[in-house]
Amino acid sequence: YEISACLVGSEMCIRDSGHNDIMQFIRPGYGASFGADGRKKAWWDALEDPGFNQMKYLKNLMLTFPFFERVPDQSVIAGTNGERYDRAIATRGNDYLLVYNYSGRPMQIDLSKISGAKKNAWWYSAKDGKLEYIGEFDSKVTSFQHDSGYLSGNDQVLIVVDSAKDYVQKAWTALPDAIQKWNK
């Protein structure tokens, strides 16, 4: 499954765009493009595949942080950004930033773009919603690369938050269901 990033207005989004059987509503016996023919799986059976459930991770990520102050901001990425699959996509609020990295390529992130002298950072898996605290950092340009390697399903979202804020707890291994969080 390919998870790709895009900007929608001032919103970063991650979407499942690689399951041909679902995208094309493949049915057995009907031809389709991109090599999908329905012999392996009909679109209704593909709804049970892992990629179909990934949108809940996007929902939890987006609703964890203040919505109306969020803006796209590629200046968060210091130095040279990659192209195509190596291009990182950034959005931020006043005290947090999110950087989607499809390929796992090393990136330089300017942590001074948000408030606070110290920042807490996590990796968030777009594939399974796992959250991994990676430490506290000074407010400066800092190198990040997830240890899962380069390409082949290693897309991650870097989450960085002003250490004075508590949007995300260091001990969390997943983001809570956002709807339940806001209904408390």
Predicted regions and their residues:
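Juxtamembrane C-terminal module of membrane proteins
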Residues: 137-140
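Positively charged, low-complexity/disordered segments
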Residues: 1-9
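Aromatic- and carboxylate-lined catalytic core of secreted/periplasmic carbohydrate-active enzymes
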Residues: 10-11, 15-135, 147-183
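Short strand-edge motifs at loop-to-beta-strand transitions and within beta-strands
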Residues: 142-144
